[in-house]
């Protein structure tokens, strides 16, 4: 992922024995390398690195901090200044128009955004106004059906403006209407004319440009062209997890002064989040994003109507994992949870646990169905002979049973660490931890 190496910079600062001029200069070089590798605009790289170096060598250490904490604070603040502002779309009635080039992930983003707002209590509808790509109508219809979202489209209709006009009439009772428009390989006149006409008819509250993170610094040229055409007021960066060039899209947004509204960090519907600059930079440095984690937990706990008592009483068994496994599926891979915790709380976790999938979670349920009540309540008694019996009974292998036990131990250790570090873990109790 873009800017991943910044975590190593933060670790070196936190683990350094002394902070001197030589250390600062080397640290700044590493930050420069990380930013350039992520395709951040060279001018912006110089601005950020110069500011960090100047402040690190000249500012007095604040009374409440030590030298390492002061340096981390400076790096954090200057990177935060570098990523620019975020755009928070409030939970109220609004029309949103998505634009972008072909292949940017616009249609998928339309559905993900609709699900995002639906999960937060809004009545949402999506409009299929991409009449150029034959598969766009069916793709959006299927995604809307999967996520339980109102869909409007007119199969075979070539007039996108007419579709939008009819949709607005039919969807008046919805809180949010999200319009998916046509994408192109380039900004052709015909596309620009259609976008302008749709914007005139829809009068959207938000015109959001969808940018593929993989295009790097080319994002700046695209963003400027769309902005001049219809006046975009927000950006969504997609596929941020799958490229080393995501910094280019971030710097493009800052260059033209357009805030980032959302970022897509994976293929799943839950891999879509509001862009919070402070939390984003904090995660880049491996310092976590507790606020985002708590928000996610509170929402999922509310959806699942989970009882926090088990964890709050200090108990955590395999039975708790069984009951709350669906909620964990919604949280996403363990890796994504750890990214929201400061330096992963120092826990060493196997890759197979980090990349826990829904398929694996389902298999865990089958394994637990073959356990006795005593084993579920007291996993410590599960020895090698019990593991063999459980594997045979569940139609799995002893290795898979061990994976479940390893996952259980990891999550239990995580909770202990969070309690020890006095992190706000009450919300985690709602997931049965």
UniProtKB/Swiss-Prot annotation:
Its EC number is 3.6.5.4. Part of the signal recognition particle protein translocation system, which is composed of SRP and FtsY. Archaeal SRP consists of a 7S RNA molecule of 300 nucleotides and two protein subunits: SRP54 and SRP19. This is Signal recognition particle 54 kDa protein. One of its GO terms (biological process) is SRP-dependent cotranslational protein targeting to membrane. It comes from the Archaea. It is an enzyme of class 3 (hydrolase). One of its GO terms (cellular component) is signal recognition particle. Belongs to the GTP-binding SRP family. SRP54 subfamily. GTP binds at residues 100-107, 180-184, 238-241. Involved in targeting and insertion of nascent membrane proteins into the cytoplasmic membrane. Binds to the hydrophobic signal sequence of the ribosome-nascent chain (RNC) as it emerges from the ribosomes. The SRP-RNC complex is then targeted to the cytoplasmic membrane where it interacts with the SRP receptor FtsY. It comes from Archaeoglobus fulgidus (strain ATCC 49558 / DSM 4304 / JCM 9628 / NBRC 100126 / VC-16). It catalyses: GTP + H2O = GDP + phosphate + H(+). HAMAP family: SRP54. GO terms for molecular function: 7S RNA binding; ATP hydrolysis activity; GTP binding; GTPase activity. It is found in: Cytoplasm.
